[in-house]
Structures are given as C-alpha cells and as structure tokens.
Amino acid sequence: MAREMRIVSVRELTGYIKERLESDPFLAHVWVRGEVSACTRHPSGHLYFFLKDEAARIRVVMFRSQVSRLGVPLENGTTVVVRGYLGVYERNGEYQLYAQGAEAEGAGKLHAALERLKEKLQREGLFDPARKRALPALPDTVGVVTSPVGAALKDILTIMRRRWPPARVLLAPVSVQGETAPYEIAQAIRALNGAGGVDVIIVGRGGGAPEELAAFNTEVVARAIFESRIPVVSAVGHEKDVTVADLVADWRAPTPSAAAEAVVPDQRAVRERLAAVESRLGRAVRHRLAVYRVRLEALRQRPVMASPGVLCRRRREVVRSLEERLGGAIGRRTGEGRSRLAVLSGRLEALSPLQVLARGYSICRRADGRIVRDADGVSPGERVIIWLHAGGLSCLVEETFPSRNP
C-alpha cells in the first residue's frame, strides 16, 4: 500500500530546519576560523560579511551591540576566529552565523594560555579575597603606574584635584602595551613600594582592545601586585574583560576615573561629616553642662550650703575629739610600755653576773681566759686572774684543795 504523501509549505520546511539547527547544542556555541570577505556595515550599525576558506563560505551577522565591543578590526582579507551560534534567516532560507565576538587568528591559544595562568595563580592563593586589604581613608600620597601621555593619567589627576586637593600624586611612568610593558609595570610597582610614604597605588590604562590589555594579563605583573606592601587598585578601563591584574589587586575599578574616586574621599562629603560631628559634639557638651548645672543647683539648695561655717565647726570639733582620743591612747600605751620595761629590766639585773660579784663572789680565770670551775682545773705554780665586784687580782697558785663547801 502506497504511503500517503505529506505536503508541507516552504515556511514549514524552513521552520523545521531552523528548529533542528538552533536546538543543536554543538551549534549553539562555536568558534569558526576563516577569511573575512564582502564585509559591509549597515546604517543601523550591524556588520555583514562572509567567512570563507578554500572549500566553503558562511554568511556572518554581527549586531551593533557586539560590533562596539570588537577587539580586532574586521577587514576583507584578514583571517579571524569568530565566536557565535548558528541560526536560520527564514526570509531568505539561509543559515548564517550570528557572531558574538571575533579575535585574531591564534587568539584561541592565547586564551587557553591565559586560562592556565589564572588556574595556576588561583591555586597559589593570589586571588584569595581574604588577603585583599582595605584602602586608606585619607591618603597623603597616591602612586600612579600608567603612561605619562595617556588619558588615564589626566582623568586621575582631574578627579583627585577636584575631590581631595591635599593628596600628592607620585607618577611612575611606564609603557602600558608592548613587549617591555609587563616588566616596566612590575618594576614601577616595586619602586613605589621602596619610595616610602606612598599610601596606595593605582595601576592601569585608559581602556583598549583585549589584545592591548595583554600586559595586565601577565604573571610578572600579577606577582608584583601580590608582593606589594601597599594596597593596589587596578584600573584597566575595560568593564567587559577582567584581567589577571584585576583579580590580584586589592580593589578593582572599571576606569581610571573610578579608581581615583575610590582612593580619595570627596572633600565636600568630608566637610559635611565634620560639620555633623561638630554639631553632635556641641549638643553633647551642652547637654552635659545642663546636667551639671542641675546637679550644682541641687547641691546649692542643700541647707549645709546655706551656712558652710556650721559644717566647718562640726568638722573641727570632730578633729579635736579625735586628737584628744589619740593623745590619751598614746599616753596609755607609753605608760604600759614603761612598766613592762621596768619589770624586764629588774629580771635582767637579777641575773647579771655583776650582782653575784657584789654579794662577795668572784670569778677565777686561767691565763688563757678560761673560767676555773674547780680546783682540778689549775695546777700549783700556775698564775690565775681573780675578778671581784670592783677590780681583779693576779694570783699565783701555791696549792690546790679538794672540792668542799666554803
């Protein structure tokens, strides 16, 4: 039995093809390399061109919003890598690439290398938010690392002079693009760290295409920012692309002007805050004085304050009474001490050897000073000294007698 023929319209067929193409995840995000040809810009700002190689070509559409962010010039004959998604333009029945960005050939490798660098620095902790430092509230000196002839420096100076005139600017002039730029920038950051007196550093440039920001995507600049003892503000001036310098810096500003606004206060706001503080302080002082005035008035109303002489007389009487009590206590203590001293002195006197000698006794010592306690302690012919109550005698022993009572 023959299958029933199904007839579809051109619109249905084109819609089916469109749905199949645009639902394919591979075609939703592709990178296509090719040579630009037939490039035209529509009055609306959209860009239309072909990407071709030796075997095929594809139509490309880039809308105005994407054209304004192009990092490379799209000119006939140049080879580029276009990023975008595939779609179908139903009116013409054509499939085409809707470009979301374009880079020079070889940019893919550069992008991969940049991602590897970011992963490496991330592992080492250079992007750690915990290590980022706060910016000083009132910097005296701001170091600036940028081109001396670029718009970035002019913007920074203009903003700082308007917002906070007392701040000094110490410029470390560098190239912001080119082969030597990364090393110049790193050296300038280290030089400002060694200069002394610099409170914060702004590192940046006045925007540019992605490839012109390459110096700020290098390891040497990242490590110089990380090693800086002074807080660093990155101001690359490119809001869409985040550079490695942005990730390492203590503060990221989208533009040099925004960096200047971040590092110095607005003098008008400071004056307003000071005026507010002065007003609050004045109110606090006046309130405190009012409280003390009330307390003083309450004290003045007390009866004692009406006749302070009465209080003084009472205090003098108390002092006089205390003096009398103290004098009596000292006298009693002194008398008791004298009595105890007399008793102890009598006891000591009774035990004194001099009192014993006064009763007719004597002390006999040998020539070497030892006391003779019995007759056996000396020999006939030996000389002894006999001490009396008054004076002494030097005697020669003629004879000794055995112990007996006198």
UniProtKB/Swiss-Prot annotation:
InterPro entries: Exonuc_VII_L (IPR003753), Exonuc_VII_lsu_C (IPR020579), OB-fold_nuc-bd_dom (IPR025824). The keyword Nuclease applies. Pfam families: Exonuc_VII_L, tRNA_anti_2. Coiled coil: none annotated. Heterooligomer composed of large and small subunits. GO terms for biological process: DNA catabolic process. Bidirectionally degrades single-stranded DNA into large acid-insoluble oligonucleotides, which are then degraded further into small acid-soluble oligonucleotides. Keywords: Cytoplasm, Exonuclease, Hydrolase, Nuclease. PANTHER family: EXODEOXYRIBONUCLEASE 7 LARGE SUBUNIT. Its EC number is 3.1.11.6. This is Exodeoxyribonuclease 7 large subunit. GO terms for cellular component: cytoplasm; exodeoxyribonuclease VII complex. HAMAP family: Exonuc_7_L (MF_00378). One of its GO terms (molecular function) is exodeoxyribonuclease VII activity. It is found in: Cytoplasm. Belongs to the XseA family. It comes from the Bacteria. It is an enzyme of class 3 (hydrolase). It comes from Desulforudis audaxviator (strain MP104C). It catalyses: Exonucleolytic cleavage in either 5'- to 3'- or 3'- to 5'-direction to yield nucleoside 5'-phosphates.
